[in-house]
Amino acid sequence: MLAKRIVPCLDVREGKVVKGVQFRNHEIVGDIVPLAARYAEEGADELVFYDITASAHDRVIDKSWVSRVAEQIDIPFCVAGGIKTIEQAREKLAFGADKISINSPALSDPSLISRLQDEFGRQCIVIGIDSFYDAVSDSYKVKQFTGDEAATKDTQWYTQDWVEEVQKRGCGEIVLNVMNQDGVRGGYDIKQLSIVRAICDVPLIASGGAGTMEHFKAVFELAKVDAALAASVFHKGIIDIGELKQYLHANNIAIRL
């Protein structure tokens, strides 16, 4: 059995790590490189960096901090933010990122997924999906440009349909960002993740809702995800990564110690 992964997420805006609640009201958490180094030291399996306003503001991740992170940590990391071309992806990988993630650019140009896969291989192509539960229609819908409240918009896609579409086009991994749960620390959306897991044949990363160690245990056991991403519980020191891994190991979750 492959080991499950614990993945701290660092949302980046204007060169700082920030965190919001349900994709709104972001506050500064700290500097990028020291936080990345801390999480690597604590035992994170991988890191994800989202430049949250890049796509909405039509720019690309700042390459300077990508190279500084690569110099400081020895675990894999993924970067996202405004990557719309092969050349932009190549640059980020050349500066040390192990994977690139695309979200809003893929919604604008789905063929980008297959072009990136053809060029770099699916193993380093991650698709981020910002999924919102619409209680009125009792359905899961994909949102775009969520890093900026003023720019956020609905798309034509229902979450399940988009999950299937990005797999057909060659993605190697999916991060499901459950917007309703983001930052509230009430637990992962097991129901939605289980629905997606049933149609997802590539590694699936749960994102949104982690508040306790039990939440990580539940998402691995019940939703069968491959990795759990979290931000505020790590940024605020609510959960220590090393202690979390010991807890999961003690509860028979396959995890690297």
From Swiss-Prot:
It is found in: Cytoplasm. The active site is at residues 11, 130. The keyword DNA-binding does not apply. Pathway: Amino-acid biosynthesis; L-histidine biosynthesis; L-histidine from 5-phospho-alpha-D-ribose 1-diphosphate: step 5/9. Pfam families: His_biosynth. Coiled coil: none annotated. The keyword Amino-acid biosynthesis applies. One of its GO terms (molecular function) is lyase activity. GO terms for cellular component: cytoplasm. Keywords: Amino-acid biosynthesis, Cytoplasm, Histidine biosynthesis, Lyase. InterPro entries: Aldolase_TIM, His_biosynth, HisF, IGPS_HisA/HisF, RibuloseP-bd_barrel. It catalyses: 5-[(5-phospho-1-deoxy-D-ribulos-1-ylimino)methylamino]-1-(5-phospho-beta-D-ribosyl)imidazole-4-carboxamide + L-glutamine = D-erythro-1-(imidazol-4-yl)glycerol 3-phosphate + 5-amino-1-(5-phospho-beta-D-ribosyl)imidazole-4-carboxamide + L-glutamate + H(+). It is an enzyme of class 4 (lyase). GO terms for biological process: L-histidine biosynthetic process. Its EC number is 4.3.2.10. HAMAP family: HisF. NCBIfam families: hisF (TIGR00735). Heterodimer of HisH and HisF. Belongs to the HisA/HisF family. IGPS catalyzes the conversion of PRFAR and glutamine to IGP, AICAR and glutamate. The HisF subunit catalyzes the cyclization activity that produces IGP and AICAR from PRFAR using the ammonia provided by the HisH subunit. This is Imidazole glycerol phosphate synthase subunit HisF. The gene is hisF.
